[in-house]
């Protein structure tokens, strides 16, 4: 009898405690998943601290080749941010942020890469929305052009120049994430 009564008291307590632990764990895993990935955790911690830029591709090219590579790089970056979600998830924000930092390091022209990394230390990527990302990209592009004595890029009509995708995708993307995923799956045939 006494054992049965103890079980009656302990069992609800254990259930409540396990529920609280489950809630806490699910919230903490969503917010601080980077704790388990030190290579990702270290990137934001280094922002704005004057870290030394990494020059992966130090090869010197002639001006024409440099211009072609840098133009292609910026077309890619502008296309990526122009097609970025209006309301990105936390994962999408982290992915874009790390992509922009990594692409600055792997930029094919070493001189431009170093200057871009210095700018990113002062002005880290803004990934809260498509508008924030496109505005940030245009401003950073113009800052780099100014440092490298290149003409500034016009930010007018920026989104329209680089947007890709069907109108259905663009409309549903503004609504919510589940519809966006459904439309993406409908628009593409993955059968090969």
From Swiss-Prot:
Entry cofactors: FAD
Disulphides: 138-155
Matching InterPro entries: ALR/ERV, ERV/ALR_sulphydryl_oxid_sf, ERV/ALR_sulphydryl_oxidase
The protein's name: FAD-linked sulfhydryl oxidase erv2
The keyword Lipoprotein appears for this protein: no
PANTHER family the UniProt entry points to: ALR/ERV (PTHR12645), FAD-LINKED SULFHYDRYL OXIDASE ERV2 (PTHR12645:SF1)
EC number: 1.8.3.2
Record's GO cellular component terms: endoplasmic reticulum; endoplasmic reticulum membrane; nucleus
Source superkingdom: Eukaryota
Organism lineage string: Eukaryota, Fungi, Dikarya, Ascomycota, Taphrinomycotina
Origin species: Schizosaccharomyces pombe (strain 972 / ATCC 24843) (Fission yeast)
